């Protein structure tokens, strides 16, 4: 850890300092530090900086925080560490460097977790995202018996092989910060590193939203409207891609990114419908397949763009 930081910005003192320490570490490894994508998504992997940039031959190194929404995980703010909205810190490096695991351990040291003191283990757990048509060889990263990160080598995204293979790291920020700060309830996390009246906790920032969105996700969200929104997002995705393929200069105007926004939207709407309990087991698989087909179509368009590596 950087001893020159003011006390309130040290990663063991504040949630925001914790995030800044990770951003600084990965910036020093050559990653571009991106901002969160401005759409609702279930995981940081959905960010186009990972899903689309993992495809094609061009090198790409990026890191970013991404708010993640999983409507079914809400507990009305009553569970100490389970929420429908939380933060992930995502790192993608393509091609994957040979020392990625070593870099990960150094990143833990940067936030106050020394592998010489703590029991750090990598438990084999291959990763898969059915809605993204993606999978990879992976490991859960455990610290003193608690899962804190996921470590994956992407093999396939949107149904396409990843060549070169990209390495991805996903940090569960709240869980790691709770461990570093030594608190048992996420809402007790010190957010700004201050004391007394100046102290702002995670609960001060997010508890009211967690209560209200849990009610929204389980009880209030209009299911008829959501079904219609899914169909609209699905249709828009395909319409944008069709328009892109008709363009003369395909490498510049394939519409992969606007279309992928609609894929993200469809995925989130599906998650809301799932939380409302209005999708049967059979229908659930059908919806997952429909989102996967959108992701695949967007991935195909992306690899034909200049940014995606098309010649």
Swiss-Prot record:
- Enumerate the GO terms in the molecular function aspect: ATP binding; glycine-tRNA ligase activity
Spans through the membrane: none
Give the reaction(s) catalysed. tRNA(Gly) + glycine + ATP = glycyl-tRNA(Gly) + AMP + diphosphate
Please name the gene that encodes this protein: glyQ
Question: EC annotation?
Answer: 6.1.1.14
Q: What keywords sit in the KW lines?
A: Aminoacyl-tRNA synthetase, ATP-binding, Cytoplasm, Ligase, Nucleotide-binding, Protein biosynthesis
Subcellular compartments: Cytoplasm
On subunit structure and binding partners, the annotation says: Tetramer of two alpha and two beta subunits.
- Report the sequence similarity comment from the record: Belongs to the class-II aminoacyl-tRNA synthetase family.
The protein depicted here goes by the name Glycine--tRNA ligase alpha subunit
């Amino acid at each position: 850890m950087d001893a020159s930081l003011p006390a309130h910005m040290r990663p063991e003192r504040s949630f925001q300092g914790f995030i800044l320490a990770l951003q600084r570490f990965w910036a020093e490894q050559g990653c571009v530090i991106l901002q969160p994508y401005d759409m609702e998504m279930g995981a940081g992997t959905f960010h186009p900086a990972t899903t689309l940039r993992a495809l094609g031959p061009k090198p790409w190194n990026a890191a970013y925080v991404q708010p993640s929404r999983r409507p079914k995980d809400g507990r009305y703010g009553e569970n100490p560490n389970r929420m429908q909205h939380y933060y992930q810190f995502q790192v993608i490096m393509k091609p994957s460097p040979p020392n990625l695991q070593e870099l990960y351990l150094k990143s833990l040291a940067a936030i106050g977790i020394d592998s010489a003191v703590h029991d750090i283990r990598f438990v084999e757990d291959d990763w898969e995202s059915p809605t993204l048509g993606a999978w990879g060889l992976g490991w859960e990263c455990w610290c003193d018996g608690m899962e804190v990160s996921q470590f994956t080598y992407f093999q396939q995204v949107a149904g396409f092989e990843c060549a070169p293979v990209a390495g991805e790291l996903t940090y569960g920020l709240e869980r790691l910060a709770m461990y570093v700060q030594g608190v048992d309830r996420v809402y007790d996390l010190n957010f700004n590193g201050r004391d007394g009246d100046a102290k702002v906790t995670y609960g001060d920032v997010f508890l009211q939203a967690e209560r209200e969105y849990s009610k929204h996700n389980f009880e209030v969200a209009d299911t008829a409207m959501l079904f219609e929104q899914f169909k609209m997002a699905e249709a828009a995705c395909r319409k944008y891609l069709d328009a892109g393929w008709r363009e003369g200069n395909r490498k510049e105007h394939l519409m992969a990114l606007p279309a992928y926004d609609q894929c993200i939207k469809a995925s989130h709407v599906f998650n809301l419908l799932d939380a409302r309990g209005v999708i049967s087991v059979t229908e659930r698989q059908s919806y997952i397949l429909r989102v996967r087909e959108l992701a695949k179509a967007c991935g195909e368009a992306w690899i034909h763009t200049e940014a995606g590596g098309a010649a």
